Structures are given as structure tokens and as C-alpha cells.
UniProtKB/Swiss-Prot annotation:
One of its GO terms (biological process) is uracil catabolic process. FMN binds at residues 49-50, 115, 124, 140-141, 190. Keywords: Flavoprotein, FMN, Monooxygenase, NADP, Oxidoreductase. The gene is rutA. Its EC number is 1.14.99.46. It comes from the Bacteria. Belongs to the NtaA/SnaA/DszA monooxygenase family. RutA subfamily. This is Pyrimidine monooxygenase RutA. It catalyses: uracil + FMNH2 + NADH + O2 = (Z)-3-ureidoacrylate + FMN + NAD(+) + H2O + H(+); thymine + FMNH2 + NADH + O2 = (Z)-2-methylureidoacrylate + FMN + NAD(+) + H2O + H(+). One of its GO terms (molecular function) is uracil oxygenase activity.
Amino acid sequence: MNVGIFIPIGNNGWLLSENAPQYKPSFELNKEITLTAERYGVDFVLSMIKLRGFGGKTEFWDHNLESFTLMAGLAAVTTKIKLFATAASLVMPPAIVARMASTIDSISNGRFGLNLVTGWQRPEYSQMGMWPGDQFFGTRYQYLSEYIQVLRELWGKGQSDFKGDHFQMDDCRLSPQPQADMKVICAGQSDAGMDFSARYADYNFCFGKGVNTPKAFAPAAEKLIEATRKTGRHVTTYVLMMVIADETDEAARAKWEHYKAGADHEAIAWLGQQGAADTRSGADTNVRQMADPTSAVNINMGTLVGSYATVARLLDEMAEVPGTEGVLLTFDDFVQGVAAFGERIQPLMKSRVHVQSPVPSQAEAERLAA
């Protein structure tokens, strides 16, 4: 199973809590996390794009770096790990994104890929006068379908004359083209989003669900398998999960309860209001899950809480779900969490025995000792 890190491009990572670690994003912080991940053989890092936060006492996501420029910097200081930036498609024309991606492909020597998002939080775009109106919720994947076709044409042949409802290319050129096949990620959860991923993406992200229920996301993975049967393409699932680990299950659970007790209710309320704005996409969108009050303290991503051994076992169970190629991990404390993953969790994972790391897998160590 592949493992990626969802690096903290926004303040406080993914915990809306006064009791969680409080920090601002910086290049140095993300460089430290990425270099640690690379050292332990983690496969990739991905940064989101967020143009306006949720406020509240913790000023959640009010402080953010920009995804492409951050990943360009990380490309220059890494050698092996793959890097994915996120394009806010509403405000970044596809021809410009194609060129930026090709540039980071050059910096990284072919280690770059792209995460495409449609945009769901109206204030991110209305603050710039660039929100197209709430009807966009119902047409956003048609828009993104044209967007990615322009990207693929420019990356593939260096020229596009694409004509659609949203984009009109007139002998648009791109050179140099990427040296590596440019992989594209989407996070489609609704029927329209899943159909888009099955047609155009290489990987589809979905949210994990619940606390210590590692296979609860399986219906989303099966839904993607069904969608790709219609398109005849190979697209795999990656699952977003938060890891809260410690020496014992009890210590990890105490941290989780402490974070929940400090929930930033003002920021959570803002998230709920923004999630309710989309009345056109159905009840199964990612933002609907994010805003659910059940575990909004970490935007309802699946959460693994336990000892290092418990978390390793739960991650291995996730790898057993058909169609699942990997996980995208967040941590309560990224600096400590990524190091603990490499030192204490990954060596216990049966699904990671192939990884080249300074800390060998327990299974490999036992094999060599036999």
C-alpha cells in the first residue's frame, strides 16, 4: 500500500481545536515534514489550496501558503518523494496550470503531479469577485471535465484548439512538455465527482469514516470500481485518514478526547454553513461529510486512534479493501507524527514491507534472523 502525507499548508493542520497544537504554516515546517517523510520511504506528499479560512478562536485555516509555489520549493530540496500540488480551477486557467506543472516537473525531474478541485466554499472566490454563482454547484464537474481535457492536450502534444462551453483554446501552446506522465488526482464523492474521476483522473481520494473503523470507506471504493467498469479505465482509491498514536491505546485515546473537548465551535459552525450552501450536488459530497457534527473537530475524516501497533494493524486492514492503492495521512502533530510513523508504525505494517527505510520492517527483520 502506498502512503502519502497531506502536509499542513494551512495553520493547525486538520484539527479545529483549541487543545490541538497551534502553529502557522511555513516553508521550513513543510520542508522538515517532507524530508522526514522522504527519509522513511513515504511515497508522496500533497498540499491543498485554501483561499479563506473558517475563523473562530483558532483562526482555522485563516493562514495558508500557496500550493504550487510551496511544492516548487520542496521539489528543489528533495530527490525521491513524489509531490502533488492542488489547482483551484476556478481562478487558475488550465493553460497556466499546465505550464506551472511542467515547470515543477522540470525542477523535480519528473516527480510532480496535480490535484484538481472544483471549489466548494463560496467566500474563497466571492472575496475576489470570482464566484460564478451558486448554479456552479450543479455544473462544476462539466467545467472540470473541459479543464482537464485542455491540460491533457497541452501536456500530451504541446498544443490545444479545444472548444467547449467554458474554455476556448486558439492554437494554445506549451513547451517544454512534462518529461513524466502527469498523474492527476480528484476527490470525487458525489455521483458526478465519481464519474469525473472514472473518466479523467488517475487516482480518486475519498474520506475515511469513523474512528478505528478502517474499512468503513469500502462502499466508496466499490463505487469507483463500478464507475471505471463503464469507462474502461484503471483508477484507484486513496483514503484520507488522521493518525493519533502513542505508546498505548489509552494514551492515544486521551489525546483524542482532549482535542474533542477543545473543539472550536465557531469555526465548525462556519464549516457547516458553507457545506449547506451547495443544495445541488446531493447528500454524498465530501463537504457534507466534513460538516457533519459527529466528528467535525477534524472535519470528519476517518481517524485511527491507538498505540503504534494498533494503528499499523488498522492501516493494514485498509489495504485489504478492493480497489485501494493507498492512504493520505494527517497527524495531530506532523513533525512528531511523521517521525513516529517511520520509526514505530511503518515497520509493523505488512502492507509496507517493500519500503526502503532506515528502519526495516519487523517482518523483514524476522526473515533475516531466521
